[in-house]
Amino acid sequence: MSQLTESTFHSSNPVTSFNLFYSLSRGQLRPGQCWDKRSFRRKFIWRSLLIPHLTREWMTELAQWPDLDSLLTRQPRLPVRLHRPYLAANFDRKMRLDAVRFHYHVIRQTFLPAEFKALLSNSGLQLAQIKGKDDEIFTVTMMMFPVLDKEGESTILVQNGAGDVLTKITFTFCEYHGKSTLFIGGMQGNSQLPHETTQKATKSCHGIFPKRIVMEAICRLAERLNIENVMAVSNEQHIFRSPRYHDKNKVILSDYNAFWASVGGECDSRGYYHIPRTLARKSEAEIASKKRAEYRRRYQLLDTIHEQLSLMFRH
């Protein structure tokens, strides 16, 4: 992995768009195991040739990235972003290109070098730690998962004290109608965990579901980075609704619509939920007196995420 310094993400290996395309096509550059397969490289060539103008624009964009080598180690399928559904079933190729370009522009502009390096690491960038009942520590982390790369460039997850991943939400920074936007393309629980583990975590966090904790981190991150909107894909526009996946038995395991609505989201005509950047909280007057202490503890726990994020990124 390339070394990251305060001079910020500079590479000593300038590359042209043609050289990048040629190196990937010939197998001279193999950022991940998928590129070891000739069939994968052949598909890359043919699909690229079907959209020559966008291919040229995308290869030129990637070739200009000073941190390309480092990013390809974590996102080896970056060069094929235009070839598959991405973020939402109705995102066209130009929207995909613009979204990925904008995402990494935001990262470069707002992350300190050490934070960017942590984001690229296997352990990810720790955003916050929160203390539940019995002093159990829950960790909120931002990282990259190649297996989730169709749903977004970055993922925020929460782990319990044993290190179990409870929930992940995947997103990309993009522009939507001229406004900077954090766009959520995927949400995953952990089907490998017993349901009791999630129940225990919820109880430890004073009744806050793990995905609600991650959603708080998502919104606080958007606020911290001056991202104007938070949006999310609906059940109907999830990438698995794309014709590409109709015959592949892809299943959406979460009810996206219900969760986005529960945090105040409203769906637009394109099938995207618009979520308040500041999630609503009940006032004391709305809470039964016997439950007020519990709600105060919930909000104090969520506030610790905001407090820790406020110390991160470029001021």
Where are these regions (language model features)?
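Conserved acetyl-CoA-binding loop-helix of GNAT-fold acetyltransferases
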Residues: K200-T202, H206-C219
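Terminal substrate-recognition subdomain of acyl/acetyltransferases
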Residues: M1-E153, L157-T167, E175-S180, G189-T197, ...
